[in-house]
Amino acid sequence: MQVRRSHGIALHVPDASLPQLQGYLAQPGRPLKALLNRNKVERLADGRFLYASRPYQLLNFQLQPEVVFRSSWDGDQLTIVFEHCTIHGLGRLQHLVEFQCQAWIRPEQERLLAKADLSLEFSPNGAGALLPKPLLHRTGDLALGLVTDRLEKRCRSGLIKGALNWLARNP
């Protein structure tokens, strides 16, 4: 069973030109460190990064996602694709749930457009077989809601602040 969610936002970046915002996004480490806690982002080889989130509570679980993702700039948009995500804190259920995310940040005149497609997949031989589907769907939807809320908050604060700071240093 799979639960999906898409979420997008437009972020106003006053007085920023399209070439300036392209310059900001052209080196993926810049916006990623603005979006995520820069002390928890580790650059790996080939445009890949490792990130360990801070723990958060969902129902009776203290969850801490750890993600390996790839990020690249193609001249038009920054693409972020999760390659592997481990959700620590699920105990025996850990290997029964798979989280996937693909996100894009596209620059326009005076704004950044951010979009993410998220999914949680429950193993049909594990959690999908043990728990009622309505419960799995509600729990999955709640979890994805927490993730999108957190992503939007990071975009509205960290990404905008990072872009404005970079633009001030690189007019």
Regions found by a protein language model. Name each.
Residues M1-L58:
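Hydrophobic ligand-binding cavity/cleft-lining segments
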Residues M1-R4, N60-V67, G91-C101:
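Amphipathic hydrophobic-ligand
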Residues A10-P14, R54-Y56, S72-D74, R106-E108, ...:
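Solvent-exposed residues in well-ordered beta-strands and their adjoining turns
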Residues L11, Y24, T79-T86, G91-L93, ...:
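Low-complexity, acidic/polar, glycine-enriched regions of mature
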Residues N39, P65-S71, Q100-P107:
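Hydrophobic/aromatic beta-strand elements that line small-molecule binding cavities or substrate pockets
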Residues R43-G89:
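Glycine-rich portal/gate segments that line the openings of hydrophobic small-molecule binding cavities
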Residues G91-D141:
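Beta-strand/loop substructures that line and gate deep hydrophobic ligand-binding cavities in soluble
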Residues L131-P171:
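A conserved amphipathic terminal alpha-helix motif
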